[in-house]
């Protein structure tokens, strides 16, 4: 009976630690993803140009598309 009790306690501790590890992983992913700015945030802060604005490179446009020296919508 004592061996069964010890075995159950060990199993409970292992399951508890596994649950803690899995709980931390999504939080780390959320922190990583939240550091990225949305297109609207980048535009609002002036880091990229909006639609129909003069451009010379794709990276200047929020959409990432510079066609005919003007930023595309999408």
UniProtKB/Swiss-Prot annotation:
For this UniProt record, the keywords arranged alphabetically read as follows:
Disulfide bond, Knottin, Neurotoxin, Secreted, Signal, Toxin
Cite the record's tissue specificity text: Expressed by the venom duct.
Listed Pfam families? Conotoxin
Which residues are the signal sequence here? 1-19
Q: List the molecular function annotations (GO) for this entry.
A: ion channel inhibitor activity; toxin activity
| A GO CC term attached to the entry | extracellular region
Q: Does the keyword Ribosomal protein apply?
A: no
Its subcellular locations are: Secreted
Which residues form each disulfide bond in the chain?
A: 48-62, 55-66, 61-71
Which ranges are cleaved off as propeptide? 20-46
Coarsely, its chief localization is secreted
Family membership, please give it.
Belongs to the conotoxin O2 superfamily.
Q: What is known of its domains?
A: The presence of a 'disulfide through disulfide knot' structurally defines this protein as a knottin.
Protein's UniProt name = Conotoxin VnMEKL-0221
């Amino acid at each position: 009976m004592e061996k069964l009790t010890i075995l159950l306690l060990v199993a409970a501790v292992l399951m508890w630690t596994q649950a803690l590890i899995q709980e931390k992983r999504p939080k780390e992913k959320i922190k990583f993803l939240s550091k990225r700015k949305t297109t609207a945030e980048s535009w609002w802060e002036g880091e990229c140009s909006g639609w129909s604005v003069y451009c010379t490179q794709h990276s200047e446009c929020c959409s990432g598309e510079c066609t005919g020296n003007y930023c595309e919508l999408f």
